[in-house]
UniProtKB/Swiss-Prot annotation:
The gene is nuoK. It catalyses: a quinone + NADH + 5 H(+)(in) = a quinol + NAD(+) + 4 H(+)(out). It comes from Flavobacterium psychrophilum (strain ATCC 49511 / DSM 21280 / CIP 103535 / JIP02/86). Disulfide bonds: none annotated. This is NADH-quinone oxidoreductase subunit K. Its main location: membrane. Its EC number is 7.1.1.-. Keywords: Cell inner membrane, Cell membrane, Membrane, NAD, Quinone, Translocase, Transmembrane, Transmembrane helix, Transport. It is found in: Cell inner membrane. One of its GO terms (biological process) is ATP synthesis coupled electron transport. HAMAP family: NDH1_NuoK (MF_01456).
Length: 106
């Protein structure tokens, strides 16, 4: 595994993670669909996880990989709760457009 990282280089992993994170930010800021925004947040989380794994492999330390394992478990719970909330919103409003959420009474 270390040979692959040396051949590719840590800089390329950093560039890839920055590009993925920027795609996620773009999706959150410029899209109004809740599912697209939710997927964009997951892309941002995966970019950070990839960076953790790349740095932990580069420094030959497993702590970053262990952190990513727990982060993925939390992300799975986040996906379950987030999709349940989106399904509930769709049932009430028949739309998942973020602009329609201001019509909800709390």
């Amino acid at each position: 595994m270390n040979n692959i990282l040396v051949e590719i280089g840590i800089e390329n992993y950093i560039y890839l993670c920055v590009v993925l994170f920027c795609i996620g930010i773009f999706g959150v800021l410029y899209r109004r669909n809740a599912i697209i925004m939710f997927m964009s947040i997951e892309i941002m989380l995966n970019a950070v996880n990839l960076l953790f794994v790349a740095f932990s492999t580069f420094h030959q330390d497993a702590q970053g990989q262990v952190f990513v394992f727990f982060s993925m478990a939390v992300a799975a719970a986040e996906v379950a709760v987030g999709l349940a909330i989106l399904v509930s919103i769709y049932r009430n409003l028949s739309s998942i457009d973020i602009d329609n959420l201001k019509n909800l009474k709390g």
